[in-house]
C-alpha cells in the first residue's frame, strides 16, 4: 500500500534514484537539486532573506477563528498594531452556537467584527463557513503561502503552502515581522493508481498517517504530492487527504496542479490565479512515500489517535482483541475504570456503533456529502441507538447540496443536517453518550476531544472513518460497514465539480481588507481581558515540577481542553483554571501555589520557597515535564495558560511539533530537551535549580547545567536547547513576545 524511503532520492523521468545513482547519472548535488521541488520555489518567493538556509517568510494572507483571533489581536494591539497589513480573515466557526457562558461567545464575535472594521479585515459570521472551507474557496491558489491559527491550515491541494501556528506567529505578521524557520526537509509523496469505489480521501489519509506518525517520517517537513495518481482525484478528494496531513506532524504540504485545479479555480471565479506547478526533473527529496491509491482499503482509526489506523477488514477480523486494547489504553491514559466493555458492542460477531458524524474541513466537502446521500438514498437509519449528523463545510456547499436534492435525500434517510461549523470536531456539538462509540469523518479522535469529562467519570470513544463508510454503516443500522462492502457503492470522479454560488457570502460577510477605519472603537465584552504582565527572565531560576506526564505523546487537548472550555479563551486568567484539568486536575493548584510564592518574592516579602537563595536574583516558577508534548492543535493557549500560572519551562525528550515549541518560546518559557528524561523519574514537587540561566542564554549556550532536586537529594543534569535562535533567546530573556516587541 505505502512504501517508505527514509534516505534522500532524486526524482528523474518518473523514477527515483539514490544519491549515489544520481551522482553517477551526473545530477547536481542535493543542495542544488532541492531547488527543483515545488516547495523550494514557493518558499524562495516568500523569503525576505538572501539565504535559503534560514527563512524569514511573509505570507499572502492569514486566517483565524473565534477561539483564537481575540488573543492574537490583543497581542498585536499591545505591540503597536495600527492596521492589518495583509488580508486577514476572521471566521466564527467554533463557538458558533453561543451556548456556554452567557454572552461571552457572541461578545467575541462582536469584538471580531469591530476589529475587522478598525484594522481592515474580512469577517465571516457564524454558521457561514468552516475556516478552511472558506479559505479554499476564497484565497487558496498555486504559489501562495497562507498562515492560520489552526493546525489544520492546509491548502496544499490548491498549490498553496499553508501553515498552522500559534497566535503569536500571526501577531508577528500583523506587526510586519516575519515567520522565521530553518529550511525544512521536503518529503516526496508519489501517488499512483486510482482509488477503488467506496474508498474515500479519509481512507487514504489514515493510511498515510498510520504509516508515518509514530516514526516521525515527515515530522516538521513539507509533504510534496505529485505523480500520475494526482490526476485521478477531484479537488475535494485532494483536499480531504491534504487537510489530514497535519496528523502526520508535518509542517506544511503542497500538491502539483493540473487542469482539474484550473477548472475548479475557474468555477470559484478565480481562474486567473491558476499556475501550472510540478517538481522539476532531477528534483531532490529528503525522503519518499510511494502510495498506490488502488491498494487503499476503507480504514478506521481507533481511539485515541488518527495514527491508530487499521483497515476495516482487519478490524472486523480482530475486533475483540483491538477493542480490548482500546479499553486498556483508556484505563492507562485516562484513568477510566469500571466502564462498560467495548466488546459488549459486538453482537453476533458484528460491531455496533452509536453515532456517526460527517463534519468540518475534512468531512463536510461537497463530494463527501454527495456520496453519503447517494449511499443513503431510499434507506432509513432506523429508530434505534445509532444516529447520524452532517455538517456542510460552507454555505455555498450547503446551497448546492440543497439545490441538487442531496440534503433532502440525507434528511429523508434520517440524518440531521447541521449548520456550517466545527462543533463535533472539538467537543462543542454532538457529544456522544457515556460509553458510546462514535464514527466520524473529522480530523481528530484524541482522548476527550469529543467533549466527555473524565473527572466526572465520563468516557466516550471516537474512531475516524470516511464519509462513505459512515454512510454505509448508517444504511446498515449502525453495524460497522466498509463502503466497499456495498454492492452498489458509487465511485468518485476526478472531474466531479459543483456550481459555486457565493451569494450567501455576499449577503453576510464583511469585506474590509485594505479598508481600515481607525476611528472604529473595539467592542469589548466583560470576559475579554488583556494578557497578564510577564517579567523578564531572572538571573537564576528555581523551578518546581507542577506536572509530570509519562504518556508517549501529550496532546494540546490535554494541555488545555477544547469544547466548552474554549469559550474562555478571551480571558487568559479564567482559561488557565482549566489547564491540564482532564489529565492532571492537581496541576493548577500546584502551579498557583508556586506562583503565590513568586509573587511574595517580587513584593519583597520573605518566602521559604527559595531555600535561602537570594530573592533579588533568583526567581520561582513551575515547569511541566512530558515525554513528547504538543501534538495536535496550534492553540497558543496550550502554552500561554502555563505561563499565566507562573510556568517558566517545558522539559521533554522531544517536542511533538514545531508549532507547540514555538508557542512555548513565544510565551517566554524555556524549551528544554533531555533525551533520557524518562529515566529521571521526575514527579510533581521535584525541582530544577538553574544558576546563571540568564547569562547562559545571553552567551548563546545551547545546553545549560542544572541541579535536579528530588526528595532532598541533589544531582547535576544537563538541559539542552537545540536549535534555539538568537531571537528566541531574546524573547525568553524579555519574558514573552509582547515584552520583546515593547522594548
PLM regions: where:
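Fe-S-dependent hydro-lyases/dehydratases of central metabolism
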Residues: 1-743
